[in-house]
Swiss-Prot record:
Functional note: ATP-dependent specificity component of the Clp protease. It directs the protease to specific substrates. Can perform chaperone functions in the absence of ClpP.
GO MF annotation list: ATP binding; ATP hydrolysis activity; ATP-dependent protein folding chaperone; protein dimerization activity; unfolded protein binding; zinc ion binding
Signal peptide range in chain numbering: none
Lineage: Bacteria, Bacillati, Bacillota, Bacilli, Lactobacillales
Binding locations of Zn(2+): C11, C14, C33, C36
Protein's recorded name: ATP-dependent Clp protease ATP-binding subunit ClpX
GO biological process annotation, one example: proteolysis involved in protein catabolic process
Binding of ATP, residues: P117, T118, G119, S120, G121, K122, T123, F124
One GO term describing the cellular component: HslUV protease complex
Keyword Nucleotide-binding part of the UniProt annotation: yes
C-alpha cells in the first residue's frame, strides 16, 4: 500500500523516499518502491530467458550433419541421410519442448535401428554424429545384458556409461546418445532363426523397453547389481537418443520369403551375393519381428536404416580418404621418425581383399595394417639411414619384405 503519513519512509532497497517515487509497497518493516519492482521484474525475466536459452541445443541441419559424416565415413549414403534427419528431428524436438511453444502438442521420440553387416560402419556413424554435436556418447553391447534375476549386467548400467561419459553431469547425460550394438543377438527364439541364448533374449528386450521409450531410471553409481540400501542416481531417459544396431544375419532370407522370391538352383550363390544389399533395403517391421525382436521393442525404433556391405573400392577409400584415414595415420607415425611411407595401389587392394575374406569390413583394416607394419615400426627407429619404406602387394600377402630406401647418413 502507499503510505503518506510518515515523511521519513523510504525504499528499503534503493533508499529513495516516498516523495521521489510513484508508489511504496509496505511489508513487515520493509518497503519497496515501484522502480525497484520494475527492475527486479526485468532481472527475473532476463534470467528466465537465459535459463531457457541454456536449455536450447544448437542443432546442425541435416545437410551439415551429412557433410560432416562424409568427411569421416565412406559410402552408406542412404543410412547417413536417414541418420542425419532422425538426429536433427530428435534435438529439434528437445528444443521445442524447452521453448514451451504449443504445449498441447507432444512430439514423440524416434529412436533408430541400424541394420548392416559387421564392419559396415554402424558404430562409427553414431559415434561421429555424437562427436559433431558435442553430446555425451556411450556404447553398450546387448549380449552382456540380462534380465533381472540372471547373472550379467542390468540394463541400467548402460545409463551409467553415459553418465561417466558426461562426467556425471546429469543434465548433459539426459541429452546424450547411446548406441547398443549386437541387438540382433537378443532376438527371441523363433522357427526362422537359431538363437541359442534366451536369457538375454525377450526378457532383455522387455527390460530395455522402458529406458528406450522414456522413464526415470535409478542408476547405481558404482555399477553392478542394485542393492536395497544403495544410493541411486535418478536419470530421465525421455530425451536420450537410442541408436541400436546389429548384423541381423539371415534376415534377407525372411525378406525374400515375404516378397515371394526364393533363390534356388544353378547360379544361386552368385545371385545371392549381388542381391543381398538390395533386399536389406526392403526390410520392414514385419521382417524384424519374424527375426525375433518383439513388436513392442520394434515400435520404439520407428526409424530403420540399412547399411550396405562395403566393397573393395569402398575399403580402399576408407583406407586413404577420410580425415582419420588409416594410411594417413601410419604415414604420420613414420614421418615422426623422418621416414616416408608409401603404399602401392596393389597393396591397398590386397589389404581390402583380406578384410573382405575375413568378413570384418572396415573394422578389420587396422589389424591387417598392424600385421604389415609391426616389424617396420620396430626396426625403423633404430636405423637412421632409412628415409623411405615402400609396401607392395607381396608384402601384404607375407611373400616379401618391404623395400627400404637408405642414405649413407640421415640428415
Amino acid at each position: 500500500m502507499s503510505n503518506t503519513q510518515n515523511p521519513n519512509i523510504h525504499c528499503s532497497f534503493c533508499g529513495k523516499s516516498q516523495d521521489d517515487v510513484k508508489k511504496l509497497i509496505a511489508g513487515s518493516d520493509v518497503y519497496i518502491c515501484n522502480e525497484c519492482i520494475e527492475l527486479s521484474t526485468r532481472i527475473l525475466e532476463e534470467e528466465l530467458r537465459e535459463e531457457q536459452d541454456s536449455e536450447m541445443l544448437e542443432v546442425k541441419t541435416p545437410k551439415e550433419m551429412f557433410d560432416h559424416l562424409n568427411e569421416y565415413v565412406i559410402g552408406q549414403e542412404k543410412a547417413k541421410r536417414a541418420l542425419a534427419v532422425a538426429v536433427y528431428n530428435h534435438y529439434k524436438r528437445i528444443n521445442f519442448a524447452a521453448s514451451k511453444i504449443a504445449e498441447d502438442i507432444e512430439l514423440q521420440k524416434s529412436n533408430i535401428l541400424l541394420i548392416g553387416p559387421t564392419g559396415s560402419g554402424k558404430t562409427f556413424l553414431a559415434q561421429t554424429l555424437a562427436k559433431s554435436l558435442n553430446v555425451p556418447f556411450a556404447i553398450a553391447d546387448a549380449t552382456s545384458l540380462t534380465e533381472a534375476g540372471y547373472v550379467g549386467e542390468d540394463v541400467e548400467n548402460i545409463l551409467l556409461k553415459l553418465l561417466q561419459a558426461s562426467d556425471f553431469n546429469i543434465e548433459r547425460a539426459e541429452r546424450g546418445i547411446i548406441y547398443i550394438d549386437e541387438i540382433d543377438k537378443i532376438a527371441k527364439k523363433s522357427e526362422n532363426v537359431s538363437i541359442t541364448r534366451d536369457v538375454s533374449g525377450e526378457g532383455v528386450q522387455q527390460a530395455l523397453l522402458k529406458i528406450i521409450e522414456g522413464t526415470v531410471a535409478s542408476v547405481p553409481p558404482q555399477g553392478g547389481r542394485k542393492h536395497p540400501n544403495q544410493e541411486m542416481i535418478q536419470i530421465d531417459t525421455k530425451n536420450i537418443l537410442f541408436i541400436v544396431g546389429g548384423a541381423f544375419d539371415g534376415i534377407e532370407e525372411i525378406v525374400k520369403q515375404r516378397l515371394g522370391e526364393k533363390i534356388i538352383g544353378f547360379g544361386a550363390n552368385n545371385k545371392k551375393l549381388n542381391d543381398d544389399d538390395s533386399y536389406m533395403q526392403e526390410i520392414i517391421a514385419e521382417d524384424i519381428q519374424k527375426f525375433g525382436l518383439i513388436p513392442e521393442f520394434i515400435g520404439r525404433l520407428p526409424i530403420v536404416a540399412a547399411l550396405e556391405r562395403l566393397t573393395e573400392e569402398d575399403l580402399i577409400q576408407i583406407l586413404t580418404e577420410p580425415k582419420n584415414a588409416l594410411i594417413k595415420q601410419y604415414k604420420q607415425l613414420l614421418l615422426f621418425d623422418n621416414v616416408e611411407l608409401e603404399f602401392e595401389d596393389e597393396a591397398l587392394m590386397a589389404i581390402a581383399r583380406k578384410a573382405i575374406e575375413r568378413k570384418t569390413g572396415a573394422r578389420g583394416l587396422r589389424s591387417i595394417i598392424e600385421e604389415v607394419m609391426m616389424d617396420i615400426m620396430f626396426e625403423v627407429p633404430s636405423h637412421e639411414e632409412i628415409t623411405k619404406v615402400i609396401i607392395n602387394e607381396a608384402v601384404v600377402d607375407g611373400k616379401a619384405e618391404p623395400q627400404m630406401i637408405r642414405e649413407a647418413k640421415k640428415k
